[in-house]
């Protein structure tokens, strides 16, 4: 499958906390799914958003806590899906000569061609936005959070 045949969805949030603090909240596939309003069963994940619902049949799932990454492959109907969530330590800000640690939380999905790719993309985009905003509200301790 070429890049031209894929629908790419990316979103990220930068929070004022350490990666270790973020990992306490995002410690595995089940807690991660819950933040994004997704419900996991043995081999499926139901993704719920303001745009509707869809069911991802997981064919592969890899949780790498030491690399702060979750990778999932599967299908939504006839649409091939590859997705991942990663956490990366960053410098959030430097003030008064002090480095303030931060964490970038990045979500990414690649959707192949299918009969309902646009609908699935809308659902996933809304779920990503919802999840990242709730994670930001929970983790971000910067003074401008409100």
What is each stretch, according to the model?
Residues 21-26, 32, 47, 60, ...:
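Hydrophobic pocket/interface hotspot
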Residues 1-42:
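Hydrophobic ligand-binding cavity/cleft-lining segments
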Residues 108-146:
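A conserved amphipathic terminal alpha-helix motif
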């Amino acid at each position: 499958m070429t890049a031209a045949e894929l629908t790419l969805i990316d979103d990220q949030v930068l929070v004022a906390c350490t990666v270790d603090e973020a990992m306490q909240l995002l410690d595995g596939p089940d807690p991660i799914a819950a933040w994004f309003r997704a419900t996991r069963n043995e081999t499926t994940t139901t993704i719920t958003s303001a745009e509707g619902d869809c069911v991802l049949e997981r064919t592969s799932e890899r949780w790498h806590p030491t690399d702060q990454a979750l990778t999932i492959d599967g299908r939504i109907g006839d649409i091939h899906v590859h997705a991942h969530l990663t956490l990366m330590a960053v410098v959030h800000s430097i003030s008064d000569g002090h480095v303030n640690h931060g964490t970038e939380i990045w979500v990414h999905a690649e959707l192949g061609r299918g009969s309902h790719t646009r609908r699935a993309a809308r659902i996933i985009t809304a779920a990503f936005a919802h999840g990242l905003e709730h994670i930001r509200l929970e983790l971000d301790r910067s003074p401008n959070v409100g």
